[in-house]
Amino acid sequence: MKDFLKQVSDQETKKLLELATLALETEGDFVELGCYRGDTSLLLEKLIENSKKSKKLWLYDSFAGLPEKTKEDASVAGDEFKASELFVSKREVVERFKKTGLKLPVIKKNFFENLNPETDLPEKIAFAFLDGDLYSSIKTSLSLVTPKLSDRGIMLVHDYNNPKLPGPARAVDEFLNKNPNFRLNLFETLAIIS
């Protein structure tokens, strides 16, 4: 749990679970783009199972670490994460689920830009946690999730207020400029889009 808290704070975890609980009443499945070790994935699956709702959790990750940064990721606050950093194997995530006894989610191994929205994503999405750390990953995640987001669906983007990772904020701000019907609320480093 210690490594997880370095990535997502206690307060952010509580907010994520609070919003995911609200999304249980919304049509569609839960998705997480950028699952890393599966910490939030385990929490989301447990929430779904405890709710007795017929929802699935879908996880997406390259399981090859981060892609190369782009100019949109340049930060004057210092450098955080390099290409291939945050590497965790798909097998490790699967094993973590098996150890907990939770149902294994749908797990797709690929870089986000290689996903096919028609075949790789659920038909409807109630809740999306986007944790790709970089501009291109968040921009692509938003473009994949938005057409499938249910009315009252919720998207959370991690690292919005992280000065060492400005890419997510740039991607979210561009998205909101093109999609003014969405609202943005901020909580620590989470961008809450609904």
Question: For each of these PLM feature ranges, what is it?
Answer:
Residues 1-194:
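A short alpha-helical cap/connector motif
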